Amino acid sequence: MPLYAVIRIRGTVDVPPDIDKTLYLLRLRRRYTASIYHDSLPGLRDMLRTVEAWTTYGEIEERVLEELLRKRGRIVGDKPLTDKWVEENLGLSGLGELAEKLVSGELHYHRLEEKGVKPFFRLHPPRGGFKKSIKRMFRDGGELGYRGSAINELILKML
């Protein structure tokens, strides 16, 4: 079961209502925000297909997920997600073990919201900019839609 990272690339202007609702449900409410979801969630594939023209997504690796959690993970109060907080509140040894359990499917990141973890990540625009158009699909030489493991390079550029 892959763990998908979904990043909103396009902004909020002229978004059709059905796409806006789906982006809201995915917790992608502004540009350059990211969320992570398991493939096992019912309806996720259909939701990703619906918002394909506004987002990019792919399978995230464990090492990239750990770095994303370390640099951009937040808890309530806009405080950083730290190893100490994970040990005290989740009973895990640190962010490395949290990333491992998320990738394996034992934990779901969006369900950690009950414990005080924010279910999204605020990212920077990519360093060096996008190399191609944000109006075309990745398979057609653009930046949108499914990009497989190439999502890891984009996330590292946006941290």
UniProtKB/Swiss-Prot annotation:
Gene Ontology CC terms: cytosolic large ribosomal subunit
Gene3D superfamilies attached to this UniProt entry: 1.10.15.30, Ribosomal protein L30, ferredoxin-like fold domain
Pfam families: Ribosomal_L30
SUPFAM superfamilies in the record: Ribosomal protein L30p/L7e
Gene Ontology molecular function: RNA binding; structural constituent of ribosome
Keywords: Ribonucleoprotein, Ribosomal protein
Cited HAMAP family: Ribosomal_uL30_A (MF_01371_A)
Protein name per Swiss-Prot or TrEMBL: Large ribosomal subunit protein uL30
